[in-house]
Amino acid sequence: MDIIGGQHLRQMWDDLADVYGHKTALICESSGGVVNRYSYLELNQEINRTANLFYTLGIRKGDKVALHLDNCPEFIFCWFGLAKIGAIMVPINARLLREESAWILQNSQACLLVTSAQFYPMYQQIQQEDATQLRHICLTDVALPADDGVSSFTQLKNQQPATLCYAPPLSTDDTAEILFTSGTTSRPKGVVITHYNLRFAGYYSAWQCALRDDDVYLTVMPAFHIDCQCTAAMAAFSAGATFVLVEKYSARAFWGQVQKYRATITECIPMMIRTLMVQPPSANDRQHRLREVMFYLNLSEQEKDAFCERFGVRLLTSYGMTETIVGIIGDRPGDKRRWPSIGRAGFCYEAEIRDDHNRPLPAGEIGEICIKGVPGKTIFKEYFLNPKATAKVLEADGWLHTGDTGYCDEEGFFYFVDRRCNMIKRGGENVSCVELENIIATHPKIQDIVVVGIKDSIRDEAIKAFVVVNEGETLSEEEFFRFCEQNMAKFKVPSYLEIRKDLPRNCSGKIIRKNLK
């Protein structure tokens, strides 16, 4: 089923500007409180100016341009400006350091970088020490270093006309983006995303949360992440709604921002929910217009109920990953919800549970969650220059192996168990890290928790828990292990405990387990 009809991203923005004109399209709030607003007409003009800027710097169709930026208007300008001229965006996680950033530059073949002054010294070092194709850097800040090969993005953009000067032929099959996975367990892989992928994501995610043009979708998720791009931004723009992009998440500021912009939709990850819950209760906790809170794994039922009761919201579950582009399993609009189910397969997708021999399993049996879509349309096209890795997860007929374990009930509701790589083998038993984390998270003194397996010469693996306790609290080993023994089977009780001030996380809030093993 083709719901795009040949409409690539350049056509999308020209149409949006014509249809919605002076309606507010984008609001960006910086960490310093600076707010920038753009109508659909103004945003399309900024996108055109940015496209013209790239053209004057020699960027042509098929060229790759890296973005190393925090949430800001320039990210949106570059994303769609590149798409308008057929070039390819390569967003880089703004938290990455020199080695990881250099690796992505090398493997993406990016020839130009847009970044800010705070990251410039790192890229100056990369240019001097690493073999990349990078030939020019644009800085979004006003002040510039006196170096060759560095330009002011804003000054160059503002010199450009508001109409597009270079419009090569485009197809919805053209690559729009190479988005490198978070790499929590290994080197990141470049997920190839087409114009069709992004257009479909917009329509699909708008359907998922029943978006209308009078909605306001607020997100604090990083713009270089698939959730911000495909679940939030593309959904809001495709529906003609208003998209609010906050530079960085603050638990203290979040509800004030929701109220200030009269947001009707937002998205949360477990880390956000837990930090919001430890804020002092306020009479304004329920003073908002939120209709849905898009939610991504994983949360205990006790935490979910407490959050919904305190803030007067409901969670709309959505399950996906970079390779699926959108939440391909989730709560459907108007459908019943069945916690802790992650929902049912969305339109244009099939989902089933398979065993280790790639055979479908009946309802109730645990296996790998597999998704069927159309590569380059409803799921990613491939891993960039990595056919071996592509073949490992993507079958020729469109079945994608997620690497997640779960099961399905008789009514088609799916249940997430854990990442396969997060299952601990302990004396012949399979133990789910997520299951243990959900139990331990209910301890009133614990703010954050992760469980990992460590080598054990006798029982294959031992279980180690890393916890962060609430501010002002203390937790003894005796108290911790007693709680575990009272709430889980004996073979699941952790053998080791380490109390930390924080846990290592990537840009989407996922804990980087490899840093703890």
UniProtKB/Swiss-Prot annotation:
Domain of life where this protein originates: Bacteria
The reaction(s) this protein catalyses: 4-(trimethylamino)butanoate + ATP + CoA = 4-(trimethylamino)butanoyl-CoA + AMP + diphosphate; crotonobetaine + ATP + CoA = crotonobetainyl-CoA + AMP + diphosphate; (R)-carnitine + ATP + CoA = (R)-carnitinyl-CoA + AMP + diphosphate
GO MF terms, alphabetically ordered: carnitine-CoA ligase activity; crotonobetaine-CoA ligase activity; medium-chain fatty acid-CoA ligase activity
Pathway listed: Amine and polyamine metabolism; carnitine metabolism
Broadest EC class assigned to this enzyme: ligase
Keywords from the named record: Ligase
Listed transmembrane segments: none
E.C. no: 6.2.1.48
Pfam family, one: AMP-binding
Any single biological process term in GO: fatty acid metabolic process
Function summary: Catalyzes the transfer of CoA to carnitine, generating the initial carnitinyl-CoA needed for the CaiB reaction cycle. Also has activity toward crotonobetaine and gamma-butyrobetaine.
NCBIfam families: PRK08008.1
HAMAP family linked: CaiC
Family per record: Belongs to the ATP-dependent AMP-binding enzyme family.
Official protein name in the record: Crotonobetaine/carnitine--CoA ligase
Originating species: Escherichia coli O8 (strain IAI1)
Gene: caiC
